[in-house]
């Protein structure tokens, strides 16, 4: 409609018709909203009348055009490993299990259950999904493979090797071996895992750090602020002295003072098997006063349940005769 109207405006016949009938003194009143006639001014004193036409599309045509557009399904899977059919798309857990099965079959059975391209696509998909399985260390992957092999009835490690590997991962602070409160039907005990509280262990060095800073500034004072003068030298000399001389000396003094007062210290935390409240226990020696060896008895701050913290096995157990 717009193209036809533009053609009629630029037609020479229309301009000739307008030039024959000038309307210099004619000033029409503004049309009402209900009027179908629109006045268009071409030049001063010249105006023409255009007839407005309204085209109504049938409702059936509009619904037919909008229907297929709204019903399109866009699959977000871009890798060859993924299935286009959403009903067959595997979950992250299924892909992780297949990844571990491929590793186990290749390293322990000597058989490849998938090609190198399929394995790379699976690994890339897991990394894209944010899975932590592909970022595990060799010991963590071995532990997961041993767990899956034991469940399937084909163990690759004996009980002693499995327990040693699990304890090693606990000491290293791995998250895949940490479990919540659980009950053992064989020993009829309630267990919970312990983890290292690195933040509180770091706070133990704060008093010694303050003392080391005091000694550093005292040495600067008795030397006539020679250390401050060196730290104010132009770059890069001040940067080198600060970060490669002053800071290492302060850190070394702080750690030495801490180890002189507190020896073989370890802070462990874990949830209460009864209520789940996190409790902390200290292991070590403060000024020749021992905390009690490798086991401590701790009372829950919430429910008052007595618990036994074992730093050797990194487990929380309830004493004999107690009820969870």
Swiss-Prot record:
<keyword id="KW-0809">Transit peptide</keyword>
<dbReference type="GO" id="GO:0009579">
    <property type="term" value="C:thylakoid"/>
</dbReference>
<dbReference type="GO" id="GO:0019904">
    <property type="term" value="F:protein domain specific binding"/>
</dbReference>
<dbReference type="GO" id="GO:0009773">
    <property type="term" value="P:photosynthetic electron transport in photosystem I"/>
</dbReference>
<keyword id="KW-0249">Electron transport</keyword>
<feature type="topological domain" description="Stromal">
    <location>
        <begin position="61"/>
        <end position="198"/>
    </location>
</feature>
<keyword id="KW-0472">Membrane</keyword>
<feature type="topological domain" description="Lumenal, thylakoid">
    <location>
        <begin position="220"/>
        <end position="236"/>
    </location>
</feature>
<dbReference type="InterPro" id="IPR039987">
    <property type="entry name" value="PGRL1"/>
</dbReference>
<feature type="transmembrane region" description="Helical; Name=2">
    <location>
        <begin position="237"/>
        <end position="257"/>
    </location>
</feature>
<keyword id="KW-0813">Transport</keyword>
<dbReference type="GO" id="GO:0042802">
    <property type="term" value="F:identical protein binding"/>
</dbReference>
<feature type="transmembrane region" description="Helical; Name=1">
    <location>
        <begin position="199"/>
        <end position="219"/>
    </location>
</feature>
<keyword id="KW-0934">Plastid</keyword>
<dbReference type="GO" id="GO:0016730">
    <property type="term" value="F:oxidoreductase activity, acting on iron-sulfur proteins as donors"/>
</dbReference>
<comment type="function">
    <text>Ferredoxin-plastoquinone reductase involved in cyclic electron flow (CEF) around photosystem I. The homodimer is probably not involved in CEF.</text>
</comment>
<dbReference type="GO" id="GO:0009507">
    <property type="term" value="C:chloroplast"/>
</dbReference>
<keyword id="KW-1015">Disulfide bond</keyword>
<protein>
    <recommendedName>
        <fullName>PGR5-like protein 1A, chloroplastic</fullName>
    </recommendedName>
</protein>
<keyword id="KW-0812">Transmembrane</keyword>
<keyword id="KW-0150">Chloroplast</keyword>
<comment type="similarity">
    <text>Belongs to the PGR5 family.</text>
</comment>
<dbReference type="GO" id="GO:0009535">
    <property type="term" value="C:chloroplast thylakoid membrane"/>
</dbReference>
<feature type="region of interest" description="Disordered">
    <location>
        <begin position="16"/>
        <end position="42"/>
    </location>
</feature>
<dbReference type="GO" id="GO:0005829">
    <property type="term" value="C:cytosol"/>
</dbReference>
<dbReference type="GO" id="GO:0009534">
    <property type="term" value="C:chloroplast thylakoid"/>
</dbReference>
<keyword id="KW-1133">Transmembrane helix</keyword>
<comment type="subunit">
    <text>Homodimer and heterodimer with PGR5. Interacts with PGR5, FD2, petC, psaD1, LFNR1 and LFNR2. Also interacts with a Fe-containing cofactor (FCC).</text>
</comment>
<feature type="topological domain" description="Stromal">
    <location>
        <begin position="258"/>
        <end position="324"/>
    </location>
</feature>
<feature type="transit peptide" description="Chloroplast">
    <location>
        <begin position="1"/>
        <end position="60"/>
    </location>
</feature>
<feature type="disulfide bond" description="In monomeric form">
    <location>
        <begin position="82"/>
        <end position="183"/>
    </location>
</feature>
<keyword id="KW-0793">Thylakoid</keyword>
